[in-house]
Amino acid sequence: MNQRATARRGARPLALLAYALLALCTAACAPFFPVLPERQSWADEALQKAGRMESIEAVGRDIEPTLIQVRNELINESNFSQRQSWDFISSQPVRDTQLYTLTSPTILFVENDAHKVQAVVESHLAPLGFTIRAREQKTVEDGNETRIVAENPTYGVTVNVYVRESMRASFGYETEPLKSDGSTQDPMQVADIPDRRPDWMVITRPK
C-alpha cells in the first residue's frame, strides 16, 4: 500500500511538470507558426483586381446594354429553348469592402452556325474593348463544338457562347467581383435595361 501511495504521489509532480512543459512549448512555438499568407492571398488579390476595374454600376451602364443587344440578336422567340433563372448580382464581404458579382443565366437556344455567332459577337463587343477568341473541339454528344469567349479586363466581364453541331447553343456572361461606386442605392439591383426580360424568354425548368 505504501509503495502504491508513494507512486501516486510521485506521479502528480511528473504530470504537472509535463503540463507545464507542454504549455511552455506551445507559447514558445507560436511565433514560429504565423497565419499562412495563402489564407489571405485571395482577399488581397480580389481587392487589388477590383481596384483596377470599373464598378458594378459601370458595367450596367456601359457594357450590359450591349450584351443584352447581342443576346437578343442571337436569340429570338423562334429559336429560344431554355432559361432557368434571371440575372442577379451577389455580394461578398472582403476585408472591410463589399464586392459584387453580376451573373446572367445560361440561355439555351437552337443554332449551329458558329461563324455567324462569332461575327455578331465581334461586331458589337470588339468596339467596347473586348478581346474575342474561338476554340473548336470534337465532343461525343454534340459533334463539333465551338466556344466563343469575349473578355473585357477593364470591366471584368467574360461572355461565353457555345455553338454545337447538334444545334444546342448557349449564351451567358458574368463579371469578376467588383466594387460599387455608390451611384445607386442598391448595388445588388440589376440595371434597368429595355428588353432585358422579353415576354417570350420565360423561365423553364430543366427536364
Task: Write out the residue ranges for each language-model feature.
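An acidic-aromatic pocket/loop used at catalytic or ligand-binding sites
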Residues: 30-72, 120, 126, 134-207
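A glycine-rich, hydrophobic loop/mini-helix early in the fold
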Residues: 77-103
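Well-ordered, non-transmembrane segments within structured domains
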Residues: 2-3, 93-95, 129
